Amino acid sequence: MKTLLQLAAITFLIASTATHAQITNPDNLVAPPPANPAQHHALPTADNLQWLWQYTKPTPIGRASDLRVDARFQAILSQDFKQPQAMWGATEAREPLATVIPLFLSEHGTITAEQNRYITIDGCVPSFCPAHGLLWIDLGTAHPLAVFAAVNWTPENHTTEESTANYNLWLFPNRTLDPNILPLALTTSLAHWDARLAEAHRLVPHIAQAVLIEPDGTPQPLDPAQAGANTIAPQPDTTTPHDSTTN
């Protein structure tokens, strides 16, 4: 009798673990009915980010503009990204990172899903696409890993219309990462980002410097190649009008 009870307990634990680890298939996702705008969403937790999948439809670009105005999205940013940022705004009046992220995803925004596990949201600053960003989220873990990648022009020697201009890359993870062993899926996504920009005849930057900003604000220098940068030859933007002096 004791053995039967032990087997039953083990079977229950295995079934519970499998259910918890399952990731919702975005192809089978049914979007919920529109919420009452007067109601505030509760702060999302690590286990309830499956609602993000709905914004990856329709493919191939999803609905980035709708995501940016979803209160749950801003709640995620405020909760997960508290690092100081130095890539945008005057030194004495820099906005919080959680406020800057949507700005870097505003224009030409797309949302894509990969391997039924990863979501990437990318875009650029309106009227100044030399400043652009990508938010990468791994939903395949109990506590999703999110990394915001920001690129901005280094205003020295070359204008943004020149392929020889240099850019900086910042990576902001929502939890501590080893700068020497970044997730392969993340660096692959960053490399694919440049490939998509090249295909769209938009700016492909030459990353001169890269840095990982830990959740506590500690900067960790990175080799740009180690972060997945510079896999595509740099090219100027030939499709998006912008002011090369903006920052």
Q: What are the residue ranges of the model-derived segments?
A:
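Bacterial N-terminal signal peptides
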Residues: 7-16
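Sec/Tat signal peptide C-region and signal peptidase I cleavage site
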Residues: 17-21
